[in-house]
C-alpha cells in the first residue's frame, strides 16, 4: 500500500512540531471555503451536570469559543474539550517549553499563526482561542482522506505530537498493511516509532529511522486523544 504524504507549504515547522509538549506535567505549565466538521448549536449549560469550573469558562469565553469553532467548522464542545485537556481552563498556563494560554500554543506555532491572522498578543485568552482553533483546522485539513471521526482523532494526535509523528505512524501502518487513514491503525503504529523497533525501521525508511526521528511519547499522545474524546462526548451530553 502506498501512502500519500500531504505537502505542507505553510506552517511546515509548526505542523510538524505540534502544539502540546510531550509528557509535560500540567502543573509545570500550561480564498478557499472551510468545510464544516460539525455546526455548533447555541450553548445551554445544564448546571446540574456541568462542574463549576466548566460553567465559569463557558460564561467567560463561551461566546469566543463558539464564534471561532463555527468560523472554522468545528463543534464548539470539541474545542472546550481541547482547552480542558491543554490548560485545565487556566488562561495563564505556561509550560517550561513555552506553550502558553488556554490552548497551550507553542512558540513556533504561535509565531506562524499570529502572522497569518495578524494577531499581536496570543497571551490574551480570546486571541489564544482563535489561534488554537485556526491551527486545529489546518491540521484537520491534512487528513481529508479519513472519515470525520478518524480525522478528528488524527487532528488531536497532531496537535499534541506534531503532524510529522502522525505521518510517520501512517507510513508505518501502510507498511504493515493497515489502513493509514484510520485512527486505530495510527494508534497501533505510534508505539512502534520508538528506537527499540529500529530493526523494523530499517525495512521502512531509507534513513533507517522514522522521517521525524524516533518517538518515545506515544503513550502520552494516545492518552491525550482518549481524554479529549472522552471530555468531548461528555460535553455533547451536558451542553446543548
Model-derived segments and spans:
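Short, small-residue-rich loop/turn micro-motifs
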Residues: 83, 106-110, 163
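N-terminal export signals and maturation junctions of secreted/periplasmic proteins
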Residues: 6, 10, 14, 18-67, ...
